[in-house]
UniProtKB/Swiss-Prot annotation:
GO terms for biological process: oxaloacetate metabolic process. Substrate binds at E159. Keywords: Calcium, Cobalt, Hydrolase, Lyase, Magnesium, Manganese, Metal-binding. This is Apparent malate synthase. It holds the Pfam family HpcH_HpaI. Its EC number is 3.1.2.30, 4.1.3.24. Divalent cations. Mg(2+) and to a lesser extent, Mn(2+), Co(2+) and Ca(2+). One of its GO terms (molecular function) is hydrolase activity. Involved in the methylaspartate cycle. Catalyzes the biosynthesis of malate in two steps. In the first reaction acetyl-CoA is condensed reversibly with glyoxylate to form (S)-malyl-CoA. In the second reaction (S)-malyl-CoA is hydrolyzed to malate and CoA. It can also catalyze the condensation of propionyl-CoA with glyoxylate and of acetyl-CoA with pyruvate, however the CoA-ester hydrolysis reaction is highly specific for (S)-malyl-CoA. Its cofactor is Mg(2+); Mn(2+); Co(2+); Ca(2+). Coiled coil: none annotated.
Length: 435
């Protein structure tokens, strides 16, 4: 069974939730109205007016009215997709029925919002049969309101062991004539309720990192042609921790992440994009340290590594408690083992264009050279290494460019900021390479 993606977007970077009604405010929809005005890199790829956890139970009826009002009036201008979250629970028929009623009212064509609604987010799902119940409600709503069958997309939040196991069944269930699960869009982790469902405990009370769940969600999305999104990172002041979480996620194939604030939206929108400039990393003190570019050289300015040139033409490299006496070739090999390069957008595009030209000329593989002059304690060492590029290497390098192209296609409101970030020429080349 081959995987066919049924959605235009291949990537989602940001999943931003907003309360639908705030109690005690003169305008209970003020946070919705504010979110609906976001543009450019401050606007998420997916905006989620949240009528579940982010909104108090006694405000949810008003929240439905606010969703209709704000989306009807601001939805046409909003640059991302709009997917309200409604109430649902795998163990509560009454809650599921409330969610159905909320969706039915929001999508009523007479209310003027449905033309700007891309789908809905269903929380607290259980096994695959529960997913089918939600899908059936979507189909009933579409039939009731004269909408095209399958036109409303469905995303779920994985918040239980049942839902985690259900992802393994999804690939086989999608496309069966008895359901419309091809409407599926996002698989979103909900680590808070997942932790509760798993009865997990930590000494500090903080959430476990759940790398297994994130891997399983990414795998489930890949197998079914969907998009995986990580859950909320609730320490909103810990920007570096948020970046590290996203970096770890991307290594698992999970590009998207929940954003709780406009500041997190900007971070999550920019983090997956190729960097503007390349950088060299040097392993020192058990971690990778980014070197400082100075006059075309890469300078290490730390205390965990020292280098001295001795009189016989050799070198002494001290790393932690180790003292290594090396000749020039041995030093070069040692430093090559300790260094890595993060390519810039320009580097990736240059390499892809070079490989495309070589392939056009009949070559199946070519060598790409990376070279730098390292400076440690004032001692300069030239290093270089060749990396073979074949079709597999090319396709792996293409992923960040495919992401950029997907963003450029679906988020024209970000074109100006992307041109400012990279330069108009490299943006033009990046949108053309690989096509």
């Amino acid at each position: 069974m081959s995987v066919t993606r049924h959605y235009d977007r291949e990537f989602v970077r940001t999943f931003f939730t907003s309360p639908t009604a705030v109690d005690g405010e003169e305008d209970s929809a003020k946070m919705l109205r504010s979110a609906g005005q976001l543009r450019g890199l401050q606007a998420p790829d997916v905006w989620v007016p949240d009528n579940e956890d982010a909104t108090a139970p006694n405000m949810r009826a008003e929240g439905v009215e606010n969703i209709i009002d704000v989306v009807a009036n601001q939805g046409a201008e909003f640059p991302g997709e709009i997917h309200p979250r409604v109430v649902w629970h795998r163990e509560s028929p009454a809650t599921r029925y409330k969610g159905f009623q909320q969706m039915l009212e929001i999508t009523d064509p007479e209310n003027g919002a449905v033309e700007h609604i891309d789908g809905f987010v269903i929380p607290e799902v259980g096994d695959i049969d529960d997913w089918k119940k939600a899908d059936e409600f979507f189909t009933i709503i579409e039939h009731e309101h004269g909408l095209e069958e399958g036109s409303l997309s469905m995303s779920v939040i994985v918040e239980s062991g049942e839902a985690e196991l259900a992802m393994g069944d999804l690939r086989e269930e999608m496309g069966k004539p008895s359901n419309n699960l091809e409407r599926m869009f996002l698989l979103v982790d909900g680590e808070v309720d997942y932790t509760k469902d798993m009865r997990a405990m930590t000494p500090t009370g903080e959430l476990p990192p759940w790398p297994e769940l994130r891997h399983n969600t990414s795998r489930g999305a890949s197998a079914a042609g969907l998009i995986a999104v990580d859950g909320p990172y609730d320490d909103i002041r810990d920007v570096e921790g948020y970046r590290e979480r996203m970096k770890d996620n991307r290594a698992k194939g999970m590009t998207g992440i929940w954003s709780l604030t406009p500041g997190q939206v900007v971070e999550a929108n920019t983090a997956p994009l190729p960097p503007k400039t390349g950088s060299w990393l040097l392993e020192a003190g058990g971690q990778e340290v980014e070197l400082e570019a100075q006059d075309g050289k890469q300078v290490y300015d730390g205390d965990d590594l020292s280098l001295e040139e001795v009189s016989d033409g050799g070198y002494v490299l001290q790393a932690g408690g180790d003292r290594l006496e090396l000749d020039e070739d041995e030093l070069t090999e040692e430093l090559l083992d300790r260094t890595a390069y993060i390519p810039s957008m320009t580097d990736i595009v240059d390499s892809m264009e070079e490989f495309e030209a070589a392939k056009e000329a009949g070559k199946g593989a070519i060598a790409m050279t990376q070279a730098a002059t390292l400076v440690i304690n004032g001692v300069e060492v030239d290093i270089s290494k060749d990396r073979m590029w074949d079709e597999a290497t090319y396709q792996a390098a293409q992923t960040p460019i495919t992401l950029f192209q997907d963003v450029y296609e679906h988020r024209p409101d970000q074109h100006e900021e992307l041109a400012e970030m990279y330069g108009a020429d490299i943006v033009e080349r990046a949108t053309a390479v690989g096509n």
